[in-house]
Amino acid sequence: MGVFSGSMRSLFCFLLVIFSALLLEVPLASGKAKHQLKHDVTDAFKMFEVVTSAVAVLDADGDGDLDCVVVVREHLDENKKTARYVWLLPSLNGRQAENLTYHLKEGPTPDKPVLTVDDGADGEKTANFIYTNYKNCVVVDIPFKKKRSCGLWVTKDAVHSVPQECVDQFEDNCDMEVAVFDDETCKGVLDNI
């Protein structure tokens, strides 16, 4: 009986180790952001200088709110650290076309500017510009319609050739990957930028 209980104890310990190891692996397989890639702190205003317009290509949820959305810079004051971008939301999937104006100013850190939307009735919020290559892509977690939206935005010239490092940073920092731009659904949208 003593040999049997020792074998059972060993088997139990072995199974416990295997089960624990499997539990540790579950978050990696669940689609959650991994936050493993290294990147410098984004300087949002340096990025604003380069990115005068962009289109959302990937979103972290499937609710369709960023489908075919384009942003266009209307104003940038590098000295005062203020910017204004207009979000152009086309009529799509039962959504009425609308424009939202994002007013941005310097925030607590270079990657986290403070913003208000339209007349500012919803108060100040903070955006998190997670990654940019300072050429043609931005990964940003930004307030949109009373919730956070983690997305990959690219310039018009990169829509059909999104740099892999940008996709990698999006996948590393946002929970899911949902395409929100395709030529058929978003026909004519790029004409606005």
Task: Name each model-derived stretch.
Residues 2-193:
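A beta-rich soluble binding module of mature secreted/lumenal proteins
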